[in-house]
Amino acid sequence: EEELDNRDGFRWSPDGKNIAYWQSDTRNVGTFYMINNVDSNYSRPIPLPYPKVGTANSSVKVGVIPAAGGKTKWFNVPGDPRNNYIARMDYIPGSDEVMIQQLNRLQNTNTVWVGNSKTMALKNILTDKDEAFLDIHDNIEWLDHATAFTWTSEKDGWLRLYKVSRDGKTMQLITRGNFDVVN
């Protein structure tokens, strides 16, 4: 999804034995034409599936496949995949767990899931909301041997840094004051 600045579609597990990846189904998504006018004397249209406002989005899901080959197992992330984006996904260091950020189509709710790549069980550990808009969270740093991670949120009007336990049960404010944290 280019609007979410995703430039690749896979993540290696920490032990190198599995690959988690996005699968995007663009059926029913309208065609947008870009013009290629740089590689020859005559321009040509390049068809791309691209949703416009109010039209069908691509349906995206996350799967895990053994690096040696085999059958893909799929996470069953709740919600209509055409009305939610899988905005970010990465393995948690030293584990078989994948952290998935699911952004709703209005882009004002970011639901964070931790999925076990062996059992495919999902657990919601964090939900960040804003009345208007949320930026994608790209600042995750794993702390304390991957028992906690950093999270930024504007939930009180300022962009603040938090330390969140891996299970999402505790969220500790790190930065205080009337200023935004900048990365």
Regions found by a protein language model. Name each.
Residues A67, K71-N104:
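Long hydrophobic segments that form regular secondary structure
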Residues G9-R11, A20-T26, K52-A56, D90-P93, ...:
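Beta-strand C-termini and the immediately following turn/loop, strongest in propeller blades
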Residues E1-R11, N18-F75:
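Predominantly five- to eight-bladed beta-propeller fold
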Residues V62, A87-Y91, N139-E141:
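Beta-rich, blade/repeat-based domains predominating
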Residues V60-A67, V112-M120, K163-D167:
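Beta-propeller blade signature
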Residues K73-N76, L122-T127, M171-R176:
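Beta-propeller fold detector
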Residues E1-R7, D80-I86, D130-H137, N178-N183:
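Short glycine-/Asp-/Thr-/Trp-enriched loop segments that recur within the blades
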Residues R27-T31, N83, R160:
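Short catalytic/ligand-binding loop motif for oxyanion handling, primarily in non-cytosolic enzymes
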